[in-house]
């Protein structure tokens, strides 16, 4: 075994050779200043979900999976992330493998559709090649693939109906993610895969649900969010939206398994004011006495809906409440396994 001085010199030489061959940052000592920078993130449009994710939103330079049943709000959540990225001056891309993107709805959620890059690929291979090229450019801040289930391999499209193509899609996803993860990390781009749920046949015990596209995405994703519609929201006899629960089932950048609930309103998306109101009541920033909601010495409304509308009409009060909710969370991001 080398003595300490010789070992240090040998290590310095080895590290300089590695950096010369593979570039600066290829190897680093974690004790050094700025060895691991703070994890940058993009807000989700829901303050409670940003707090649950631990880093203030979805982390940049990582793979994210949003999965859930049909009409649960998967695309809505992804479009909100795009909207927030654009507000920060970022460029967003949407790979619409399902050929079902509603531009009008995206616009209502605050997406600047004129600046949005949209691709409607014919095959799964084409979709993932486009995604790789965009991420490799280094200019994209967030890229959404909607959805993994619609990434149909070329062989399946060109084959006859009824042909067996066992494991083709899983192999395609595995190969693509092996190539993508490295360049996603270097480019600081947030790549969101939207996924659907399927039922495993013959499962007697445990959860019969699984996601499409094999297991590769489960492993490569730094954050996995399970989104579910838990109740319908009504105003009189009219349906105005749905109460939605999101569970962070995997999180490599903060403690996982946190759950949040918020409203998704039809034609409006995530109810930011409703979300802030619920969180403020939970944290005693807003007081609830019977049906009345009070902030400071001022009553803001009778009933949750009236209070939500008050916050919508008074953005300066909403911003003030939001600031009080965010400030104690600044040191709450506890990085887990990175």
Curated annotation (Swiss-Prot):
SMART domains: AAA (SM00382). It holds the Pfam family RecA_C. The keyword Cytoplasm applies. Keywords: ATP-binding, Cytoplasm, DNA damage, DNA recombination, DNA repair, DNA-binding, Nucleotide-binding, SOS response. ATP binds at residues 68-75. GO terms for biological process: DNA recombination; DNA repair; SOS response. Can catalyze the hydrolysis of ATP in the presence of single-stranded DNA, the ATP-dependent uptake of single-stranded DNA by duplex DNA, and the ATP-dependent hybridization of homologous single-stranded DNAs. It interacts with LexA causing its activation and leading to its autocatalytic cleavage. Belongs to the RecA family. This is Protein RecA. It comes from Geobacter sp. (strain M21).
